[in-house]
Amino acid sequence: MNAVRGRFAARTVRVKAPGKINVSLDVGPLREDGYHSVASVYLAVSLYEEVAATSTATEGITVSISPASTLDLSDVDIPLDERNLAYKAAAIMADVSEHSTGVHLEITKRVPVAGGMGGGSADAAATLLACDALWNSGLSRDELAHLAAELGADVPFALLGGTAVGLGVGDELSPALAKAQMDWVLVTADYGLSTPEVFRTLDRLRLAEGLTVDEPAAVDPKILQALRSGDADALSRVLVNDLQRASIELAPGLRDTLGLGESCGAIAGLVSGSGPTVALLTHSPEAAAGLAEDLGHHGLNALAVHGPVPGARIISDTLL
Protein backbone atom coordinates (compact mmCIF):
# COMPACT_ATOMS: atom_id res chain seq x y z
CA MET A 1 0.00 0.00 0.00
CA ASN A 2 1.51 3.31 -1.09
CA ALA A 3 -1.25 5.81 -0.77
CA VAL A 4 -1.93 9.05 1.02
CA ARG A 5 -5.63 9.77 1.13
CA GLY A 6 -6.20 13.30 2.33
CA ARG A 7 -4.20 13.46 5.52
CA PHE A 8 -3.97 9.70 5.90
CA ALA A 9 -0.57 8.10 5.40
CA ALA A 10 -0.25 4.34 5.61
CA ARG A 11 2.24 2.93 8.09
CA THR A 12 3.50 -0.62 8.49
CA VAL A 13 4.86 -2.17 11.67
CA ARG A 14 6.51 -5.55 11.20
CA VAL A 15 6.95 -7.89 14.18
CA LYS A 16 8.44 -11.36 14.52
CA ALA A 17 7.52 -13.85 17.22
CA PRO A 18 9.01 -17.31 17.86
CA GLY A 19 7.54 -20.74 17.83
CA LYS A 20 8.12 -22.92 20.87
CA ILE A 21 8.80 -26.45 21.91
CA ASN A 22 7.86 -28.12 25.17
CA VAL A 23 10.90 -29.75 26.74
CA SER A 24 8.71 -30.97 29.58
CA LEU A 25 4.95 -31.49 29.71
CA ASP A 26 3.20 -33.14 32.65
CA VAL A 27 -0.57 -33.42 32.17
CA GLY A 28 -3.03 -33.79 35.02
CA PRO A 29 -6.43 -35.52 34.97
CA LEU A 30 -9.43 -34.17 33.08
CA ARG A 31 -11.02 -31.39 35.13
CA GLU A 32 -14.72 -30.69 35.51
CA ASP A 33 -14.37 -27.66 33.24
CA GLY A 34 -13.05 -29.85 30.43
CA TYR A 35 -9.46 -28.65 30.69
CA HIS A 36 -6.30 -30.28 32.04
CA SER A 37 -3.83 -28.72 34.44
CA VAL A 38 -0.27 -28.92 33.18
CA ALA A 39 3.27 -28.31 34.38
CA SER A 40 5.41 -27.48 31.40
CA VAL A 41 8.72 -25.94 30.40
CA TYR A 42 8.52 -23.88 27.23
CA LEU A 43 11.53 -23.02 25.09
CA ALA A 44 11.27 -20.35 22.38
CA VAL A 45 13.24 -21.40 19.31
CA SER A 46 14.65 -19.65 16.25
CA LEU A 47 11.74 -20.38 13.92
CA TYR A 48 9.66 -17.24 13.57
CA GLU A 49 6.29 -16.06 12.38
CA GLU A 50 6.13 -12.49 11.05
CA VAL A 51 3.17 -10.14 11.01
CA ALA A 52 3.17 -6.90 9.03
CA ALA A 53 0.38 -4.64 10.33
CA THR A 54 -0.48 -1.83 7.91
CA SER A 55 -2.89 0.95 8.81
CA THR A 56 -5.82 1.47 6.45
CA ALA A 57 -8.02 4.52 5.96
CA THR A 58 -11.21 2.53 6.37
CA GLU A 59 -12.36 0.68 9.47
CA GLY A 60 -12.08 -3.07 9.74
CA ILE A 61 -9.52 -5.86 9.92
CA THR A 62 -8.29 -7.85 6.95
CA VAL A 63 -5.83 -10.75 6.94
CA SER A 64 -3.69 -12.32 4.21
CA ILE A 65 -0.90 -14.88 4.06
CA SER A 66 2.38 -13.64 2.61
CA PRO A 67 3.76 -15.40 -0.48
CA ALA A 68 7.10 -15.30 1.37
CA SER A 69 5.79 -18.01 3.73
CA THR A 70 8.12 -21.00 3.75
CA LEU A 71 5.39 -23.57 4.42
CA ASP A 72 3.46 -25.47 1.79
CA LEU A 73 -0.03 -24.26 2.63
CA SER A 74 -1.78 -25.66 -0.43
CA ASP A 75 -3.67 -28.24 1.61
CA VAL A 76 -4.04 -26.14 4.76
CA ASP A 77 -7.23 -24.23 5.50
CA ILE A 78 -6.14 -21.12 7.41
CA PRO A 79 -9.14 -18.92 8.22
CA LEU A 80 -8.63 -15.27 7.31
CA ASP A 81 -11.67 -13.95 9.17
CA GLU A 82 -12.62 -13.52 12.82
CA ARG A 83 -11.69 -17.16 13.48
CA ASN A 84 -8.02 -16.30 12.91
CA LEU A 85 -6.11 -15.70 16.15
CA ALA A 86 -4.24 -12.72 14.69
CA TYR A 87 -7.57 -11.18 13.67
CA LYS A 88 -8.84 -11.66 17.22
CA ALA A 89 -5.69 -10.00 18.59
CA ALA A 90 -6.19 -6.97 16.34
CA ALA A 91 -9.84 -6.75 17.37
CA ILE A 92 -8.88 -6.71 21.04
CA MET A 93 -6.28 -4.01 20.42
CA ALA A 94 -8.81 -1.93 18.46
CA ASP A 95 -11.21 -2.08 21.41
CA VAL A 96 -8.52 -1.21 23.95
CA SER A 97 -7.02 1.64 21.94
CA GLU A 98 -10.41 2.89 20.66
CA HIS A 99 -8.75 3.36 17.30
CA SER A 100 -10.99 4.40 14.43
CA THR A 101 -8.86 3.31 11.46
CA GLY A 102 -8.48 -0.22 10.20
CA VAL A 103 -5.55 -2.56 9.77
CA HIS A 104 -4.38 -5.14 7.28
CA LEU A 105 -2.37 -8.06 8.66
CA GLU A 106 0.00 -9.90 6.35
CA ILE A 107 1.27 -13.07 8.02
CA THR A 108 4.44 -14.83 6.97
CA LYS A 109 4.09 -18.46 8.07
CA ARG A 110 7.19 -20.44 9.00
CA VAL A 111 6.07 -22.36 12.09
CA PRO A 112 4.21 -25.57 11.14
CA VAL A 113 0.42 -25.25 11.23
CA ALA A 114 -1.17 -27.50 13.88
CA GLY A 115 2.33 -28.74 14.66
CA GLY A 116 2.37 -28.29 18.45
CA MET A 117 4.70 -25.27 18.20
CA GLY A 118 2.27 -22.42 18.79
CA GLY A 119 2.43 -20.82 15.34
CA GLY A 120 -1.02 -19.27 15.60
CA SER A 121 -0.17 -18.04 19.09
CA ALA A 122 2.99 -16.41 17.72
CA ASP A 123 0.84 -14.66 15.10
CA ALA A 124 -1.43 -13.34 17.85
CA ALA A 125 1.46 -12.14 20.01
CA ALA A 126 3.09 -10.42 17.04
CA THR A 127 -0.21 -8.75 16.16
CA LEU A 128 -0.71 -7.42 19.69
CA LEU A 129 2.72 -5.80 19.67
CA ALA A 130 2.37 -4.50 16.10
CA CYS A 131 -1.04 -2.92 16.68
CA ASP A 132 0.10 -1.45 19.99
CA ALA A 133 2.89 0.35 18.11
CA LEU A 134 0.77 1.16 15.05
CA TRP A 135 -1.97 2.80 17.10
CA ASN A 136 0.34 4.28 19.76
CA SER A 137 -1.62 2.52 22.49
CA GLY A 138 1.29 2.73 24.93
CA LEU A 139 0.48 -0.53 26.72
CA SER A 140 3.09 -2.05 28.98
CA ARG A 141 4.37 -5.58 28.43
CA ASP A 142 2.34 -6.70 31.46
CA GLU A 143 -0.81 -5.19 29.97
CA LEU A 144 -0.11 -6.86 26.63
CA ALA A 145 0.49 -10.16 28.45
CA HIS A 146 -2.92 -9.83 30.12
CA LEU A 147 -4.57 -9.38 26.71
CA ALA A 148 -2.50 -12.28 25.37
CA ALA A 149 -3.90 -14.58 28.05
CA GLU A 150 -7.43 -13.78 26.84
CA LEU A 151 -6.50 -15.13 23.41
CA GLY A 152 -5.05 -18.50 24.40
CA ALA A 153 -2.73 -20.37 26.73
CA ASP A 154 0.32 -20.18 24.43
CA VAL A 155 0.03 -16.51 23.42
CA PRO A 156 1.62 -15.00 26.57
CA PHE A 157 4.71 -17.16 26.07
CA ALA A 158 5.10 -16.11 22.42
CA LEU A 159 5.10 -12.54 23.70
CA LEU A 160 7.60 -13.35 26.48
CA GLY A 161 9.93 -15.80 24.75
CA GLY A 162 13.04 -17.24 26.38
CA THR A 163 12.39 -20.13 28.74
CA ALA A 164 9.42 -20.31 31.07
CA VAL A 165 7.53 -22.63 33.37
CA GLY A 166 3.83 -22.87 32.59
CA LEU A 167 1.26 -24.00 35.15
CA GLY A 168 -2.54 -23.97 35.24
CA VAL A 169 -3.62 -24.61 31.65
CA GLY A 170 -0.18 -23.39 30.61
CA ASP A 171 -0.93 -19.68 30.85
CA GLU A 172 0.47 -19.10 34.36
CA LEU A 173 3.99 -18.24 33.26
CA SER A 174 7.14 -17.81 35.32
CA PRO A 175 10.32 -16.88 33.42
CA ALA A 176 13.13 -19.36 34.00
CA LEU A 177 16.71 -18.11 34.20
CA ALA A 178 17.99 -20.49 31.55
CA LYS A 179 19.88 -18.65 28.83
CA ALA A 180 22.41 -21.27 27.72
CA GLN A 181 21.87 -22.13 24.06
CA MET A 182 20.56 -25.56 23.18
CA ASP A 183 20.66 -26.87 19.62
CA TRP A 184 17.75 -28.84 18.21
CA VAL A 185 16.47 -30.33 15.00
CA LEU A 186 12.75 -30.02 14.34
CA VAL A 187 11.15 -32.63 12.13
CA THR A 188 7.90 -31.24 10.80
CA ALA A 189 5.04 -33.22 9.31
CA ASP A 190 2.86 -32.61 6.28
CA TYR A 191 -0.22 -33.07 8.45
CA GLY A 192 -1.51 -31.61 11.70
CA LEU A 193 -2.88 -33.06 14.91
CA SER A 194 -5.82 -31.56 16.75
CA THR A 195 -4.75 -30.60 20.26
CA PRO A 196 -8.19 -31.38 21.78
CA GLU A 197 -8.16 -34.77 20.07
CA VAL A 198 -4.71 -35.57 21.46
CA PHE A 199 -5.88 -34.71 24.98
CA ARG A 200 -9.02 -36.83 24.52
CA THR A 201 -6.87 -39.73 23.34
CA LEU A 202 -4.66 -39.41 26.43
CA ASP A 203 -7.78 -39.50 28.64
CA ARG A 204 -9.01 -42.60 26.81
CA LEU A 205 -5.66 -44.40 27.16
CA ARG A 206 -5.49 -43.60 30.86
CA LEU A 207 -9.06 -44.76 31.42
CA ALA A 208 -8.42 -48.04 29.58
CA GLU A 209 -5.38 -48.67 31.78
CA GLY A 210 -7.14 -47.66 34.99
CA LEU A 211 -4.41 -45.08 35.45
CA THR A 212 -5.01 -42.19 37.83
CA VAL A 213 -2.70 -39.19 37.96
CA ASP A 214 -2.33 -36.28 40.33
CA GLU A 215 -2.58 -32.62 39.50
CA PRO A 216 0.92 -31.49 38.44
CA ALA A 217 2.25 -29.00 40.98
CA ALA A 218 5.68 -28.22 39.60
CA VAL A 219 8.20 -29.19 36.94
CA ASP A 220 11.19 -31.41 37.62
CA PRO A 221 13.96 -29.11 38.93
CA LYS A 222 16.52 -31.25 37.08
CA ILE A 223 15.11 -29.91 33.80
CA LEU A 224 15.66 -26.31 34.85
CA GLN A 225 19.14 -27.13 36.15
CA ALA A 226 20.09 -28.69 32.81
CA LEU A 227 18.72 -25.71 30.89
CA ARG A 228 20.56 -23.24 33.12
CA SER A 229 23.87 -25.04 32.72
CA GLY A 230 23.46 -25.80 29.03
CA ASP A 231 24.09 -29.50 29.74
CA ALA A 232 22.47 -31.28 26.81
CA ASP A 233 23.28 -34.74 28.16
CA ALA A 234 21.60 -33.98 31.48
CA LEU A 235 18.58 -32.53 29.69
CA SER A 236 18.30 -35.61 27.48
CA ARG A 237 17.72 -37.77 30.56
CA VAL A 238 14.74 -35.75 31.82
CA LEU A 239 12.80 -34.85 28.68
CA VAL A 240 9.16 -35.81 29.17
CA ASN A 241 5.85 -35.33 27.38
CA ASP A 242 2.74 -37.01 28.74
CA LEU A 243 0.96 -36.30 25.44
CA GLN A 244 3.54 -38.15 23.38
CA ARG A 245 1.96 -41.58 23.55
CA ALA A 246 -1.42 -40.11 22.60
CA SER A 247 0.15 -38.35 19.61
CA ILE A 248 1.82 -41.61 18.56
CA GLU A 249 -1.50 -43.43 18.96
CA LEU A 250 -3.00 -41.01 16.43
CA ALA A 251 0.08 -40.83 14.19
CA PRO A 252 2.17 -44.03 14.60
CA GLY A 253 4.82 -42.78 12.19
CA LEU A 254 6.04 -40.42 14.91
CA ARG A 255 7.63 -43.41 16.66
CA ASP A 256 9.65 -44.13 13.52
CA THR A 257 10.73 -40.49 13.28
CA LEU A 258 11.95 -40.51 16.87
CA GLY A 259 13.85 -43.75 16.33
CA LEU A 260 15.42 -42.54 13.09
CA GLY A 261 16.46 -39.28 14.72
CA GLU A 262 18.28 -41.04 17.51
CA SER A 263 19.88 -43.57 15.15
CA CYS A 264 21.20 -40.63 13.08
CA GLY A 265 22.86 -39.03 16.09
CA ALA A 266 20.34 -37.15 18.22
CA ILE A 267 21.01 -37.39 21.95
CA ALA A 268 17.29 -37.70 22.61
CA GLY A 269 13.99 -36.64 21.15
CA LEU A 270 10.36 -36.09 21.97
CA VAL A 271 7.13 -35.03 20.35
CA SER A 272 6.68 -31.31 21.01
CA GLY A 273 3.42 -30.57 22.80
CA SER A 274 0.51 -32.24 21.07
CA GLY A 275 2.63 -32.85 17.96
CA PRO A 276 3.20 -33.83 15.28
CA THR A 277 6.47 -31.85 15.29
CA VAL A 278 9.35 -33.91 16.70
CA ALA A 279 12.17 -32.11 18.55
CA LEU A 280 15.58 -33.78 18.54
CA LEU A 281 18.29 -32.60 20.92
CA THR A 282 21.93 -32.33 19.80
CA HIS A 283 25.26 -31.23 21.29
CA SER A 284 26.11 -28.30 19.00
CA PRO A 285 25.03 -26.17 16.03
CA GLU A 286 27.27 -28.30 13.81
CA ALA A 287 25.68 -31.51 15.07
CA ALA A 288 22.21 -30.07 14.52
CA ALA A 289 23.05 -29.01 10.96
CA GLY A 290 24.48 -32.45 10.19
CA LEU A 291 21.49 -34.26 11.67
CA ALA A 292 19.05 -32.09 9.72
CA GLU A 293 20.93 -32.88 6.52
CA ASP A 294 20.96 -36.63 7.25
CA LEU A 295 17.24 -36.68 7.98
CA GLY A 296 16.62 -34.72 4.81
CA HIS A 297 18.30 -37.53 2.89
CA HIS A 298 15.69 -39.84 4.43
CA GLY A 299 12.92 -37.70 2.98
CA LEU A 300 12.04 -35.82 6.17
CA ASN A 301 11.57 -32.08 6.50
CA ALA A 302 14.15 -31.24 9.17
CA LEU A 303 15.24 -27.82 10.41
CA ALA A 304 18.17 -26.95 12.68
CA VAL A 305 17.17 -24.37 15.31
CA HIS A 306 18.42 -23.07 18.64
CA GLY A 307 16.87 -21.69 21.79
CA PRO A 308 16.07 -19.90 23.90
CA VAL A 309 15.38 -16.78 21.84
CA PRO A 310 13.50 -13.58 22.77
CA GLY A 311 9.75 -13.22 22.36
CA ALA A 312 7.84 -10.90 20.02
CA ARG A 313 9.98 -8.01 18.76
CA ILE A 314 9.43 -5.10 16.35
CA ILE A 315 11.78 -5.46 13.38
CA SER A 316 10.65 -2.46 11.31
CA ASP A 317 8.32 0.54 11.50
CA THR A 318 7.81 2.28 8.16
CA LEU A 319 5.71 5.22 6.98
CA LEU A 320 4.59 4.44 3.43
From Swiss-Prot:
Keywords: ATP-binding, Isoprene biosynthesis, Kinase, Nucleotide-binding, Transferase
Pfam name, any one: GHMP_kinases_N
Chain residues that bind ATP: P112, V113, A114, G115, G116, M117, G118, G119, G120, S121, A122
GO molecular function annotations of the record: 4-(cytidine 5'-diphospho)-2-C-methyl-D-erythritol kinase activity; ATP binding
Intrachain disulfide bonds: none
Active site per the UniProt annotation: K20, D154
SUPFAM superfamilies linked to this entry: GHMP Kinase, C-terminal domain, Ribosomal protein S5 domain 2-like
GO BP, sorted A to Z: isopentenyl diphosphate biosynthetic process, methylerythritol 4-phosphate pathway; terpenoid biosynthetic process
Top EC group: transferase
Protein name: 4-diphosphocytidyl-2-C-methyl-D-erythritol kinase
Organism name: Arthrobacter sp. (strain FB24)
